[in-house]
From Swiss-Prot:
Its cofactor is Mg(2+). This is Malate synthase G. Signal peptide: none annotated. It is an enzyme of class 2 (transferase). Keywords: Cytoplasm, Glyoxylate bypass, Magnesium, Metal-binding, Oxidation, Transferase, Tricarboxylic acid cycle. Gene3D superfamilies: Malate synthase, domain 3, Malate synthase, domain III. Involved in the glycolate utilization. Catalyzes the condensation and subsequent hydrolysis of acetyl-coenzyme A (acetyl-CoA) and glyoxylate to form malate and CoA. The active site is at 338 (proton acceptor), 629 (proton donor). The keyword Magnesium applies. It holds the Pfam family MSG_insertion.
């Protein structure tokens, strides 16, 4: 492969040419200065990056040794004393309040769903950006949120019986979200706007008003017969679409043809766990899509029902306010970008000594450069109206690593001529050392932080790896009931509120991983806003629309205010180790656990390694489709490695299980023409060997991360195909 030397950086030609030909020409940034500054950042900060990773390993060695001598901690005071002694658990400083400035309301004050989407896939990225609004009728009709009983089957064509149930559900929702005086929404016959108020006439001819006139936010069309009514509740919008020409509208007394909800308020465009980018060629795909999003010209041809069309970013729409004055409603999700963490290095660029550069530094510099199309001196200001860039930084271990990310961002700002603290930071609370030192982590980024989020999946993977030597872990399905989990979730909210995040930043909760089970999500995920989270992750635009209903039912700002006086969750609970005290699992239970873990690992890894797909819906052992990414992979691999280490299972048992479940995964992928079967090809299947590595060498992986194995095996496969 060819490289271009720029100030001591040997950049792969495909990446260099992308920067020089596609990114830099549209910006008021001198190319030579950019590369000189980029090189200085890499050469100054890469040694610090390496030192922080070495510290992770040093701490793990000490913790492993302690567990070998003591087992799972019985005396929590003694355990905490040890963690303080080695510098794992740090002293907590005085109280403070974050001081982040120029934060868009989508993050600072609007509570609502958040999508995480692989930015490597242009279609998914566009769908997510456009998921700021979604049809509640469609979301209910097309999912199991409405049961298919009593003749309400989905079918291949429109089922009026099902439609009636959807409409009834939505009318009940409107009765609680924007109630009318002396009238139910099911009895509405017409709308008009008079004297700055929404006037409703019932099918009986009676006039009614909104119980709270502040719920009326605007309209489109003629005031006497509007085509769109905009309502607002708890800071987020509802749009009622009136159109008698449609099948639904014609049959409706008020000609309501649809009800749309403001849905994915924010979206994380992901360069990390949901993608498979292992070389310069892959990274250019990532960066090119981010460029299209920042320039506003990303497009993708989409084939549907025998025809195709070009999907682009939705434009904002003009509405008339209650007073008749025009205003604009945002129709795109506010975009954050998730860079990779501090661990990985990339072959896309080599430093002056021939070392691969830290990928997190590369991401910060290049995604930051591209963001100038939105926030630079001549930026569009179509993503961030306040001129901020939002970077989610994952997998950081403790405040020293957060401070290092702050230093990277500062250096990038200087290189790009941006004011200090333009680049905001989202802190993923997904590593144990960050959790227990969360207040100090936030302090390290107090002028930049816009987001803290519990990542149950990665956090469980780190929990298992950190305490690998303590004993065999409880079964994976029992982990959600472990003492540390609820304490961790509450602690994140408690610390966030203590540090003044309310009204300034997001306090987030994790992913609903079952995209087909929307009825269950509607029932259960309301727990997130009730717990004080003003955002939570959803797996699809449809899920975002359904989850948005929870933010109409729960006033998160009020919940947060009520939680400020709650006693902080206990550190001792967070530090409790989820080992099985007296494991008495039957052979059948052990095998079922192995089967379930192996199936998830293989189903995800085979598509990652063979096809470069970083996020997959993988059927579990009960045939429930689960969203799998590297975080879920980390749990499953570490869990199997833990049981192997503590002799709950044998290596032979794991290999037999993997081989048997490979055949199951092969059958599940039989309809995919690009799929390469693993069964009968175990020695030559690079994907199967990667899955085995993740388990059999799980204890050796840094903090239990899966990226080193996946990247190595994917590069091996790509090299094999180009040989």
């Amino acid at each position: 492969m060819s490289r271009v030397d720029k100030n001591g950086l040997a950049i792969e030609t495909v990446l260099h040419d992308f920067l020089v030909e596609e990114v830099l020409p549209g910006l008021a940034v001198d190319a030579d200065k950019f590369f000189a500054d980029f090189s200085a950042i890499v050469h100054d900060l890469a040694p610090k990056n390496c030192a922080l990773l070495a510290k992770r390993d040093e701490l793990q060695v000490k913790i492993d040794d302690w567990y070998r001598r003591h087992g799972a901690p019985a005396d929590m005071d003694e355990y905490q004393s040890f963690l303080r002694e080695i510098g794992y658990l740090l002293p907590e400083g005085s109280d403070f309040q974050v001081s982040t400035q120029n934060v868009d309301p989508e993050i600072a004050s609007i509570a609502g769903p958040q999508l995480v989407v692989p930015v490597m896939n242009a279609r998914y990225a566009l769908n997510a950006a456009n998921a700021r609004w979604g049809s509640l009728y469609d979301a209910l009709y097309g999912t199991d949120a409405i049961p298919e009983s009593d003749g309400a089957e989905k079918g291949k064509s429109y089922n009026p019986k099902r439609g009636e149930k959807v409409i009834a559900w939505v009318r009940d929702f409107l009765d609680t979200s924007a109630p009318l005086q002396d009238c139910r929404w099911k009895d509405v016959g017409s709308f008009a706007v008079k004297d700055g108020a929404l006037v409703v006439r019932s099918i009986d001819g009676e006039q009614a008003m909104l119980t709270d006139g502040k719920h009326f936010a605007g309209y489109r069309g003629d005031a006497a017969a509007p085509t769109h009514i905009l309502l607002k509740n708890n800071g987020i919008h509802i749009e009622i679409v009136i159109d008698a020409a449609t099948t639904i509208g014609k049959a409706d007394p008020a000609h309501i043809s649809d009800v749309w909800l403001e849905s994915a308020i924010t979206t994380i465009m992901d360069c990390e766990d949901s993608i498979a980018a292992v070389d310069a060629e892959d990274k250019v795909v990532v960066y090119r899509n981010w460029l299209g999003l920042m320039k506003g010209d990303l497009q993708e041809e989409v084939a549907k029902g025998g025809t195709s069309f070009i999907r682009t970013l939705n434009p904002d729409l003009q509405y008339a306010g209650p007073d008749g004055a025009a205003f604009e409603v945002h129709r795109r999700s506010l975009m954050l970008v998730r860079n990779v963490g501090h661990l990985m290095i990339s072959p896309a660029i080599l430093d002056r000594d021939g070392n691969e550069v830290p990928e997190g530094i590369m991401d910060a510099a290049i995604t930051g450069l591209i963001a100038l199309y939105d926030i630079g001196p001549s930026g569009r200001r179509k993503n961030s109206r306040t001129g901020s860039m939002y970077v989610v930084k994952p997998k950081m271990h403790g405040p020293e690593e957060v401070a290092f990310a702050v230093e990277i961002f500062s250096r990038v700002e200087d290189a790009l001529g941006l004011p200090r603290n333009t680049i905001k930071m989202g802190i993923m609370d997904e590593e144990r050392r960050t959790t227990v030192n969360l207040k100090e982590c936030i302090r390290a980024a107090r002028e930049r932080v816009v987001f803290i989020n519990t990542g149950f999946l990665d956090r469980t993977g780190d929990e298992i790896h950190t305490s690998m030597e303590a004993g065999p872990m409880i079964r994976k399905g029992d982990m959600r009931q472990a003492a540390w989990i609820s304490a961790y979730e509450n602690w994140n909210v408690d610390i966030g509120l203590e540090c003044g995040l309310a009204g300034h930043a997001q306090i987030g909760k994790g992913m609903w991983a079952m995209p087909d089970l929307m009825a269950a999500m509607l029932e259960q995920k309301i727990a997130h806003p009730k717990a004080g989270a003003n955002t939570a992750w959803v797996p699809s635009p449809t899920a975002a629309t359904l989850h948005a209903t929870h933010y109409h039912r729960v006033n998160v700002a009020r919940v947060q205010q009520g939680l400020k006086d709650r006693a902080r969750a206990k550190l001792s609970d967070i530090l409790s180790v989820p080992v099985a005290v007296r494991p008495n699992w039957t052979p059948e239970e052990i095998q079922r656990e192995l089967d379930n873990n192996a199936q998830g690992i293989l189903g995800y890894v085979v598509r990652w390694v063979d096809q470069g797909v970083g996020c997959s819906k993988v059927p579990d052992i009960n045939n429930v489709g689960l969203m799998e990414d590297r975080a879920t992979l980390r749990i499953s691999a570490q869990h199997m490695a833990n049981w192997l280490h503590h002799k709950v299972v044998t290596e032979a048992q794991i290999i037999e299980t993997m081989r048997r479940m490979a055949a199951v995964v092969d059958r599940q992928n039989a309809s995919d023409p690009a799929y390469q079967p693993m069964a009968g090809n175990f020695d030559d299947s690079i994907a199967f060997q990667a899955a085995l590595d993740l388990v059999l060498k799980g204890r050796e992986q840094p903090n239990g991360y899966t990226e080193p194995v996946l990247h190595r095996r994917r590069l091996e496969l790509k090299a094999k195909h180009t040989a």
